[in-house]
C-alpha cells in the first residue's frame, strides 16, 4: 500500500493549508463559486494545450493555464460586487459555465476527450509525483509569504470592505492581487486533483471552521486539521474500497461537514462579529 499511497498522502498533508486560508477569504467575501470558476478557467487552458497536442506536464502548458486564470482574475477584480447592480456571483457563474462549455468543445478535437473531461473534474491524485508535490509546495510557500506581508490589506478587504474604501485603499488593485495569487494556487493544484477537489478543499474546511469558532486563527486551525484528516481518510477509503480517490475524498469532506454542523449546534454561540 505504501508504495502506491505515499506521495498522495504527502500531498494531502503538505498542500491544503494555504487553500483553507484562501477559502476563509472566499467564504467571507460571499463569492463561493469563484474557486470553481477559477479552477475551470485553469482547466480551459489545459484543454487548449491538449487541443494543440502539447505535453500536459510541460512548463508551456502551465503558463497557458495560468494565463487563462489571470484573465479570470482581472475579470472578477474589475467587476467587484461593491458597485453596480449585477451581483458578482452572476458574473462568476457565467464565467464558469462558458469555460466549462469551451472546455468540452476543445476536448471534442481530442481522441481522448471523454477521459480528459473526467480527469479535469476529479483528477487523479494517485498519480502525483514527488516533483509535482515539492514544486507546488514551493509555489504555495511563495504565495503564502506574499499574503503574510499583505495580510492587513487582504483582511480589511474581506472583513471590513467599507473601511477599506473609506481610507482610500485601491480596492480593484488589491482585489486583482488577491485573485491573481488565488489563481496561481488554483492553477497548480487543479492539475493534480481536478476541479471538484479544488472546490472541496477551498470551501468545506473553511465552512467547518466558521461553524465552530469565532476567531479567524482558530477557524483556520480547525479548517487545516479537518482538511488533513479528510484528505488522508478519503485516500484510505478509496484504497481499501477500490473507489476513485478524488470522489472518495469529496464524499468524506461532505460527511465531515455534516458532523461539524451537528457539533456546532452544541459548542458555538452566535457571534456579533468576527475577531480577526
At which residue positions do the language-model features occur?
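Hydrophobic alpha-helical segments within and immediately flanking transmembrane helices
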Residues: 18-22, 36-52, 72, 99, ...
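Helix-loop-helix "hairpin" substructures at the membrane interface of multi-pass membrane proteins
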Residues: 129-205
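Transmembrane alpha-helical segments in multi-pass inner-membrane proteins
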Residues: 196-247
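Transmembrane helix-bundle core of multi-pass membrane transporters
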Residues: 83-153
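Small-residue-rich segments of transmembrane alpha-helices in multi-pass membrane proteins
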Residues: 39-48, 94-106, 127, 171-181, ...
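Short loop segments and helix-boundary regions at transmembrane helix junctions
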Residues: 24-37, 47-112, 209-221, 238-241, ...
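Membrane-interfacial amphipathic/re-entrant helices at transmembrane-helix boundaries
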Residues: 1-17, 88
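Cytosolic-side transmembrane-helix boundaries in multi-pass membrane proteins
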Residues: 36, 243-276
Amino acid at each position: 500500500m505504501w508504495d502506491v499511497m505515499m506521495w498522495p498522502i504527502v500531498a494531502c498533508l503538505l498542500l491544503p493549508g494555504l487553500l483553507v486560508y484562501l477559502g476563509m477569504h472566499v467564504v467571507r467575501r460571499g463569492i463561493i463559486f469563484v474557486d470553481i470558476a477559477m479552477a475551470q478557467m485553469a482547466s480551459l487552458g489545459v484543454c487548449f494545450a491538449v487541443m494543440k497536442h502539447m505535453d500536459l506536464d510541460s512548463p508551456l502548458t502551465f503558463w497557458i493555464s495560468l494565463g487563462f486564470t489571470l484573465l479570470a482574475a482581472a475579470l472578477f477584480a474589475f467587476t467587484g460586487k461593491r458597485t453596480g447592480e449585477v451581483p458578482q456571483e452572476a458574473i462568476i457563474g457565467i464565467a464558469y459555465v462558458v469555460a466549462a462549455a469551451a472546455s468540452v468543445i476543445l476536448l471534442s478535437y481530442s481522441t481522448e476527450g471523454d477521459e480528459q473531461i473526467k480527469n479535469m473534474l476529479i483528477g487523479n491524485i494517485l498519480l502525483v509525483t514527488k516533483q509535482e508535490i515539492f514544486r507546488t509546495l514551493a509555489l504555495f510557500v511563495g504565495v503564502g509569504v506574499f499574503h503574510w506581508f499583505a495580510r492587513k490589506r487582504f483582511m480589511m478587504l474581506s472583513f471590513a470592505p467599507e473601511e477599506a474604501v473609506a481610507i482610500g485603499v485601491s480596492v480593484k488593485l488589491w482585489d486583482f492581487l488577491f485573485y491573481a495569487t488565488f489563481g496561481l494556487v488554483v492553477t497548480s493544484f487543479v492539475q493534480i486533483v481536478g476541479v471538484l477537489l479544488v472546490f472541496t478543499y477551498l470551501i468545506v474546511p473553511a465552512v467547518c471552521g466558521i461553524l465552530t469558532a469565532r476567531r479567524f486563527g482558530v477557524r483556520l486551525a480547525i479548517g487545516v486539521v479537518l482538511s488533513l484528516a479528510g484528505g488522508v481518510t478519503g485516500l484510505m477509503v478509496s484504497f481499501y474500497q477500490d473507489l476513485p480517490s478524488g470522489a472518495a475524498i469529496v464524499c468524506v469532506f461532505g460527511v465531515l461537514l455534516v458532523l461539524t454542523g451537528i457539533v456546532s449546534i452544541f459548542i458555538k454561540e452566535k457571534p456579533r462579529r468576527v475577531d480577526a
